[in-house]
């Protein structure tokens, strides 16, 4: 069947914070954007799940804070392989982008004086995290949604983008599949913005929504985009461990920011042994500390450690950690009097599509913003910087894509659409392997070999297993069902997950040191000669970018 074809000035893939902010900016330029989302618009991304806050150096609580200090903290936290140009833009523009959010209707907690309140997060010299209780992301995405609706921006739900339409190094739009009926859907656009988020679901334990399997990384790489820092995967130190159905669900850093303490099964407050900053060390340090406690036998019976706020006044918990209180009450734990059990969970990809200061990639007409892009956060993201990233670079990508669309004409794409239609059609066939079997094998390989602690042995093992799983894709059982076809969608997702996993593993094998979230037990030291980013091109050939 011939694809349904949509046309627009700017196609935006993803309806989270970065995608919405980009769409608003395109609309501001009097052009026509379309937002396409793999799930329900505004609900399937990770922005709405971000609980802790938004970093901006307003200096409302600590007058000594400034964008310069924010810059230094971010570079230090990222192991100094962040792109300093992007970091400078982030810290300088984050305050104005928060003011934009307030204009859209977002509310942030304030002090009695009326000034914004700011809480401490890991790796900060001064308190700079603006927040709305422990549901900041939800407040942000609600305001952004209302602004998108007010501007009458078209949103298309439940379409999985399967490829970018590329000719002679130029992106002319994208191709996808309707999740509802498995029919092909095509988009022709003068500019395309990737804002599709990360890939937490290449791991079995993650804080991400179900849609985050690396689609954006994979389709960008297949199209010829350069990716950087793909070895840098952040494991948030505190995800739920019990019950099994909630394993990996985020326990916000705001819990530690408000004074929560980490205890092992022996009742020891252990973080002081690992870092003088204690519970507010950077996430990579805290995650490895918790991992070590568990591996050395000081974990809880459910495979975690304790996070305790019972010493805090009830009113602090009820007002500033309300979501956490309700989240744990739902599983029978009252955090006002009982500790939480937590363990690391795959959370954020610092690496991604390489961008410049305006979200441009190495492919003409393709832009990227948010978690799918790389360079802002380096080897480790500071809590509170991600939400700021979505707004700062979502806006910039929107401006850049709009200007590009004004000077570009839409080109004929029918032959490119037909090629992708045929590729998807050919995936429907009889085979001997269910997609879920390969996904489970991938999860096991990534969790055991490419997670918090890595080595040459583990990474080479993972590369071999991923290659074997790639070979099995040709024998997937994807029967024709008519209408909704879960096996087809799983098969399409699996290819993207395997590509993303191979990018992560390949890059991790190349970096022979430990830096930020990338820890090699065979190279445990940070080495000065590795103060550089690893770039992988379409041929998986590494290039190095000195920082």
From Swiss-Prot:
Temperature dependence: Optimum temperature is 75 degrees Celsius.
An annotated GO BP: fumarate metabolic process
Catalytic activity field: coenzyme B + coenzyme M + fumarate = coenzyme M-coenzyme B heterodisulfide + succinate
Cofactor binding note from Swiss-Prot or TrEMBL: Binds 1 flavin covalently per subunit.
TM region positions: none
NCBIfam families, sorted: PRK06263.1
Assembly information from the UniProt record: Subunit A of the heterodimeric fumarate reductase of methanogenic Archaea, composed of subunits A (TfrA) and B (TfrB).
UniProt-recorded name of the protein: Fumarate reductase (CoM/CoB) subunit A
């Amino acid at each position: 069947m011939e694809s349904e074809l949509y046309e627009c000035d700017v196609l935006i893939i993803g309806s989270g914070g970065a995608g919405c902010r980009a769409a608003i900016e395109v609309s501001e330029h009097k052009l026509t954007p379309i937002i396409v989302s793999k799930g329900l618009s505004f609900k399937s991304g990770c922005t709405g799940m971000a609980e802790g806050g938004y970093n901006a150096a307003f200096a409302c609580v600590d007058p000594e804070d400034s964008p310069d200090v924010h810059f230094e903290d971010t570079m230090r936290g990222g192991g100094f392989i962040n792109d300093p140009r992007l970091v400078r833009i982030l810290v300088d523009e984050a305050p104005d982008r928060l003011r934009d959010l307030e204009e859209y209707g977002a509310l942030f907690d304030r002090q009695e004086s009326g000034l914004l309140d700011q809480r401490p997060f890991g790796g900060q010299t001064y308190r700079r995290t603006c927040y709305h209780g422990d549901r900041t992301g939800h407040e942000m995405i609600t305001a952004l949604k209302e602004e998108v609706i007010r501007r009458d921006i078209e949103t298309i739900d439940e379409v999985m983008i399967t490829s970018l339409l590329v000719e002679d190094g130029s992106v002319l739009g994208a191709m996808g599949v309707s999740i509802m009926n498995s029919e092909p859907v095509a988009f022709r656009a003068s500019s395309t913005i990737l804002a599709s988020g990360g890939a937490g679901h290449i791991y079995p334990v993650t804080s991400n929504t179900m849609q985050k399997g690396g689609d954006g990384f994979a389709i960008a790489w297949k199209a010829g985009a350069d990716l950087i820092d793909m070895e840098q995967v952040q494991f948030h130190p505190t995800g739920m461990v019990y019950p099994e159905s909630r394993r990996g669900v985020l326990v916000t850093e705001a819990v530690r920011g408000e004074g929560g303490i980490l205890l092992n099964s022996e009742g020891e407050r252990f973080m002081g042994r690992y870092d003088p900053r204690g519970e507010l060390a950077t996430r990579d340090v805290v995650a490895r500390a918790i991992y070590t406690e568990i591996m050395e036998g000081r974990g809880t019976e459910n495979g975690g450690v304790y996070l305790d706020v019972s010493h805090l006044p009830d009113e602090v918990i009820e007002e500033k950690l309300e979501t956490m209180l309700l989240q744990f009450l739902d599983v029978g734990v009252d955090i006002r009097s009982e500790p939480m059990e937590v363990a690391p969970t795959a959370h954020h990809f610092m690496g991604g599509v390489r961008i410049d200061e305006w979200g441009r990639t190495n492919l003409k007409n393709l832009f990227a913003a948010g978690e799918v892009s790389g360079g802002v956060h380096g080897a480790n993201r500071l809590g509170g910087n991600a939400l700021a990233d979505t707004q700062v670079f979502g806006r910039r990508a929107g401006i850049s894509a709009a200007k590009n669309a004004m000077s570009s004409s839409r080109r004929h794409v029918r032959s490119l659409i037909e090629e992708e239609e045929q590729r998807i059609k050919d995936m429907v066939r009889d085979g001997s392997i269910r997609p879920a079997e390969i996904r489970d094998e991938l999860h096991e390989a990534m969790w055991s070999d490419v997670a918090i602690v890595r080595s040459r042995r583990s990474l080479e093992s993972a590369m071999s297993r991923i290659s074997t799983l790639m070979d099995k894709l040709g024998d997937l059982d994807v029967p024709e069902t008519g209408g909704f076809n879960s096996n087809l969608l799983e098969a399409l997702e699996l290819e993207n997950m395997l590509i993303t996993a191979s990018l992560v593993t390949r890059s991790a094998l190349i970096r022979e040191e430990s830096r930020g979230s990338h820890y090699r037990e065979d190279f445990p030291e940070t080495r000065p000669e590795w103060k550089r980013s690893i770039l992988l091109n379409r041929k998986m050939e590494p290039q190095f970018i000195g920082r």
